[in-house]
Amino acid sequence: AADTATTHRLLAPSHARLAAHDDAIVRAQITVAQIAAPTGEETERGGWVSRRYRDYGLDDIHTDDAGNVIGRRPGIADLEPVVICAHLDTVFPRETDLSIRRQGDRLVGPGINDNGRGIAVMLALASEIDGSRVRSRRPIEFVATTGEEGVGDLKGAKHYFAKRGRNAHATIALDGAGDERIIHRALGSRRFRISYSGPGGHSWAAFGAPNAVHAAAGAAARLAALSLPSVPRTTLSVGRIGGGLSVNSIPDSAWLEIDLRSTSSNHLDDFERVIRRIAQIAADEENAKRSLGTRMLTVSIESIGARPCGETSPDHQLVQSAIEATRLVGRHPDLALASTDANVPISQGIPAIAIGAGGRGGDAHTHAEWFDNVHGTIGVARALTIVMAAAGVA
């Protein structure tokens, strides 16, 4: 923490320059939010980020096989890099109206906060850590990641940290607004699609054939009745269910999708086994009721998402530095749990946190999403101090 305080003082001229460019950072935020980037379709937004990397003179600018846009600022020493990442993708379909409008002090529109803010501030830091006014001891890699949201399943982060970033010294993910939260605990999740398939038929003439919807409903009912631990907190939800052709048909297929979350990898393992067992029990029960000579119902289980969990210890230097940097800008540190790009390095033992990039925001993942740049410069200064405390001021 003492090193963080020293770093913060040394960076005072940088904090002043970034504050002077506050309007430009917000303009970049508006620009990036208006470039469509649905999960899996981040190419156009990634290209815009790549051009900004070139404008700022980063080295080794490239797009990897997962679509991550990477740029590097060399350090004065040949050491493992500090990684700054911000996700490119949004939850909004391509056809969404991405216009950003002002409502009083707020900017309102899809993606203006999550993650237009994170991308804009990552680029502002890339511009300020220019190798002359501000130089770092360690190299710093700037990574605009793909597939952070929903079905993206942390695709970009998983690819980057499995390969190029596997030896990173530390990682700071910039995600949305805020200047107090320090996400050092990674909420893990597993998602499954259970599918039932049977012969189907007419609701009268084929009565007695196993009913795929009955099996799916039976599985959902059993899952809903499970007793889940509060410590470590574990949640399970049947998020979607469907099947059948018409009201007067015995469905030949049905499916349900399940979201399982926990802070414990052991609990994720345990409840995955429970889910698989219940899926089979529901099929067995429906088959036990079928008429002689009818084809049996079958069940399949597909994994449609897996986000790892873990924790960077609150006593670790990176977390302590983030706590001190938050206090140095006059804010109150809030140690938190969430699912972010930082899940991946945390699960691999790489020290990592996710933080907000300044200002205030709300209504994420809706068309009413908003950002208010109140004290936005404070969050930018905090982010720079945390990054440079990890990388070392040269």
List the predicted regions and their residue ranges.
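N-terminal hydrophobic or amphipathic helices/low-complexity stretches enriched
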Residues: 1-35, 186-188
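A non-catalytic alpha/beta surface segment that caps or lines the substrate-entry region
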Residues: 28-31, 35-80
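Acidic/histidine-rich catalytic neighborhood of metal-dependent amide-processing enzymes
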Residues: 106, 111, 115-187, 229, ...
